[in-house]
Amino acid sequence: MSETSLLPRAHGAAVLSAAMRSTPDDFQLDELPAFEPSGEGEHLLLTVRKRGQNTAYIAKQLAHWAGIAEMGVSYAGLKDRHAVTTQRFSVHLPKRIAPDIAALDDAQMQVVQSAWHNRKLQRGALHGNRFVLTLRQVQGEREAIEQRLQAIAARGIPNWFGEQRFGRDGANVAAALAMFGHVQAEDGTLLPAPTSRRRLRNDQRSMLLSAARSVLFNRVLGARVAQGSWDSALQGEAWMLDGSRSVFGPEPWSEALAERLARFDIHPSGPLWGVGDLRSADQAAALEQGALSDPQSEALRQGLEAAGLKQERRALRLRPQGLDYRWLEAQTLQLEFALPPGCYATAVLWELGDVTDAGRFNVGMRADA
């Protein structure tokens, strides 16, 4: 397995090539909140529109503005720097006295809404994210592109973890291997990693654990896509309820399951690796174990188990909600859609074709690192 190998496309060969994010306005994201503010309490909810800055930087600015420690500022999820995004932050102000909110507004961020709430904002506390993406220098037949978009809307896409989870050139996965005591030689051989005295911060460790889990999931999903079963049932399937983390099965295939699968009420699932038995069995479990039988995957699995993570599941299939498109110019295509928390817009782009992302790197779904 090579560093640059990419996962398969479920809908066939690429139908376009394009460029994205020559300007932050080409990538717009708005959080879809999970609740309305209570109007009382000691947590000030600020809805911030930011441009060209990442979430951690804005959180630091808010802490400085409020005169509190950074841990007093919370948010539901991390948003990209190279974009125009709208997201909520909660600022803990026990005395319910807020500095001048207008002082926060500048070219990089604007507060578009503020309200008090009785609890701090928790990670993942949102319904999802709505994206408006502008692709420029589009090459490809318009009819084929539109047919692919219609197929994506009808059938969905594989629920890949995006390239940004793994860092540039898969650096986060290599760092996770090192954290687990391994280094990979050019020929793929795993060797003991040199002993390091450097202690990782909790957030760094969490990032590397997530990268390790994500690349293992992508390898299983890649095997299902190659087999053509990413959106259908295998014997021993562990099913995930749409819009939740609830998992059930395996159970015998039935007409009722087929109907639920067809209406996107349930999805096949894959492992987020950790301690414990796989929820799948039979054919599904055999595929998962086979996809993760190489030495690097085995090392990542053992490292995640040693770190104490528990076995969880993630849906293999994802259907973008409200997918719409418009041609702004002959070679400029704008896409709009919503995704659940933890799902990646780059997974949608990957099913269309090869997109060069000026804000980051080429859009690709990594099988290996």
From Swiss-Prot:
Transmembrane segments: none annotated. It catalyses: uridine(13) in tRNA = pseudouridine(13) in tRNA. GO terms for biological process: tRNA pseudouridine synthesis. Keywords: Isomerase, tRNA processing. Residues 156-318 form the TRUD domain. Pfam families: TruD. One of its GO terms (cellular component) is cytosol. The keyword Heme does not apply. It is an enzyme of class 5 (isomerase). InterPro entries: PsdUridine_synth_cat_dom_sf, PsdUridine_synth_TruD, PsdUridine_synth_TruD_CS, PsdUridine_synth_TruD_insert, TruD_catalytic, TruD_insert_sf, TruD_pseudoU_synthase. One of its GO terms (molecular function) is tRNA pseudouridine(13) synthase activity. The active site is at D80 (nucleophile). Its EC number is 5.4.99.27. Belongs to the pseudouridine synthase TruD family. Responsible for synthesis of pseudouridine from uracil-13 in transfer RNAs. NCBIfam families: PRK00984.1-2. This is tRNA pseudouridine synthase D.
